């Protein structure tokens, strides 16, 4: 089972997390930019702001803790280009050699 962190919890990040979950065989974590953003998605299990109408199953973890990146085998970056540099700076301490980084920005 692959451990995948989707970096960015907007419409695109949420859609990718759902798609990877539906394919099966992956442990998915959706990494939001703030605890408030994570809570807004985690409590209703839906990204009401950016992707309403799509239920997030309980198997998809939702967090704002950058340390989740350290446990991932694959990190999928879907943050808007204007926020990419500061976001990567925040997760850099948690990146490990051998991790696969995918840019879907």
Predicted segments with their positions:
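NAD(P)+-binding Rossmann beta1-loop-alpha1 motif at the extreme N-terminus of oxidoreductases
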Residues: 1-51, 61-64, 90
């Amino acid at each position: 089972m692959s451990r995948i962190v989707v970096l960015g919890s907007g419409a695109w990040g949420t859609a990718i997390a759902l798609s990877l979950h539906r394919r099966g065989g992956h442990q998915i974590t959706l990494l939001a930019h703030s605890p408030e953003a994570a809570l807004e998605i985690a409590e209703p299990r839906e990204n009401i702001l950016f992707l309403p109408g799509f239920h997030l199953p309980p198997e998809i973890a939702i967090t704002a803790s950058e340390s989740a990146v350290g446990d991932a085998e694959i990190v999928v970056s879907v943050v808007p280009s204007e926020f990419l540099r500061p976001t990567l700076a925040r997760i850099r301490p948690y990146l490990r050699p051998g991790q696969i980084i995918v840019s879907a920005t």
